Amino acid sequence: MAAKIKKGDTVVVLTGRDAGRSGEVIQVMPKEDKAFVRGVNLVKKHQRQTQNQEGGIISKEAAIQLSNIAVADANGKPTRVGFRILDDGRKVRFAKTTGDQIDG
């Protein structure tokens, strides 16, 4: 199945603690059906001190389920993603709400 959410996409969180917030996808893990979104689903991590890093409590993004996020359209609203095949044979993603092309 083709990837509907890719690294670099702007997404909106649909459910959970951060519902309504948006951010850029940092990493997608398709086998686990999870993604990391910049500035969303932050957790506190207790970092041990090392030779080149100071110890303490740091904020870090945690993975979020792909079913709980949606790609944002040009208006910043969540949209479903469809696929089109262009005249030159390329397969591209498009926003179902506006019909705008997402990539390429």
UniProtKB/Swiss-Prot annotation:
Domain of life: Bacteria
Keywords of this entry: Ribonucleoprotein, Ribosomal protein, RNA-binding, rRNA-binding
Example of a GO cellular component annotation carried by this entry: ribonucleoprotein complex
SUPFAM superfamilies assigned to the protein according to its UniProt record, in alphabetical order: Translation proteins SH3-like domain (SSF50104)
GO biological process, one term: translation
InterPro entries according to UniProt: KOW, Rib_uL2_dom2, Ribosomal_uL24, Ribosomal_uL24_CS, Ribosomal_uL24_KOW, Translation_prot_SH3-like_sf
GO molecular function: rRNA binding; structural constituent of ribosome
S-S bonds: none
Coiled-coil ranges (or none): none
Family, per entry: Belongs to the universal ribosomal protein uL24 family.
Quaternary state and interactors: Part of the 50S ribosomal subunit.
Role summary: One of two assembly initiator proteins, it binds directly to the 5'-end of the 23S rRNA, where it nucleates assembly of the 50S subunit.
HAMAP family reported in the protein's UniProt record: Ribosomal_uL24_B
Name of the molecule in the record: Large ribosomal subunit protein uL24
Source organism (scientific name): Methylorubrum extorquens (strain PA1) (Methylobacterium extorquens)
Gene name, Swiss-Prot/TrEMBL: rplX
